[in-house]
Amino acid sequence: MSTVPLNEIGQEFVRNKIGLVGIGILATLFIISAMAALTIPLETLKTWNNPESWLEFPKTALPAWINLFLSEKIPEHKILTNSEDSLQSTEELTIFSQQFSVVYEFDDFPNDFIYEFTAKYSGSPLLQISVIRPDGMTVELLSRSLPYLESAVHHERVFSTDNAVKKNLILQSEKFGFLLNDISAEQIVFSESSVQKVLNGKYVFLIRLVGTSSENEIVKSSLILGGKVFGFVGTDELRRDLSVGLLWGTPLALFIGIAVAIGSVVMGLLYGVYAGFIGKKTDETMMRFNDVIYALPALPFLIILAVTISNSIFVMVGFLMIFGWVGVAKVSRSMALQIKTRQYVEASKIMGQRSSKIILKHILPQLLPYAFASVAISVPAAITTEAGLSFLGLGDPSFPTWGQILHDASTHGAAARGLWWWVIPPGLMIAVTGLAFVFIGNALDTIVNPRLKR
């Protein structure tokens, strides 16, 4: 391992195509990390494992771009928030009305539909939901009283799977030319009247809040048509948007990999250089301790520590540092043994300079090229180790790391069920991130080690 000046390393690196490819991939990953930090709220991390926070998304939906390659279009997930509101009042009744319009142009039925609302009212008003279909038929979906309140706010979700919705539809079976008992509410609503076939066109959902108080109103509402494709990466079994997990997983992976690599390389560098420079019994004792740590099986110990102490991502980073410095220490010691025999180091000793000053001024600067290469090469190992622990269920569940996504996919049998969009993207991100640092590390290693040059 030669000691190449840093300016020469830079000049050589820009001529290395593999190294530049690695830099390009790494720059892209940093841009993705910045996008995640700027566009996705931090609260998403706290709600990642809360099913209530993802109810408005579809379950195990394919990526939306899949429709570009299909002749029969799969229904897209739609969240409608813009409604036409109106208020009608008489001496006895107040009717607050909402109207959601949607053009449905797909070749399959939606998964479900959900009406979510927050209403402010007093008493026990009547909630009525109906839909005007493209063929002009009006279908009543729901008609029931809301819980009695005295001027308070009420939040509720009405699902197409509710028994009350299905019963109302069965009562209108004379409008359809096929049996309704064994099919879902969304299939009835979005089907032609004569045959069970998708009816495309404009659907208008009407919501009415009928009561005696003039203050009755729907403060906030949305209509969700549960599609089978959603977003760029799709969703998982818990309805979570996988693109959020992949985006947040990028800065987390870079933090884990870079923090562990820098920490372990710095520890190993200082430890090995000090042992090699001091020598004698100090060197012997330190190297025997190094051998003990080196002989420990890292993965079983990491599993035991994660189970018994903590599975926090920060504790895991510390554990990975503890087991990652020993190899660097051995190499840096051997390099320090060579450098300390040079004349300028001997001259510094004769002049009475302190050992710490000699190490910092004459030895460590010459090991920096090796340190940079070691950092780059160590990052993939840290990322894959964290992913492996998370895949085994020993990771930090509060953070959506790529390993945690793969663990959830394994738990729900994603591979066996053919949910490829839940398995391939996180695995691909782990591979690409590791590849970027391998390219950079190999390029640096080729520059600082002439024996590797072709």
Predicted regions and their residues:
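Alpha-helical transmembrane segments of integral membrane proteins
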Residues: 235-454
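Gly/Trp-centered helix-boundary motif
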Residues: 1-257, 409-427, 431-432, 445-454
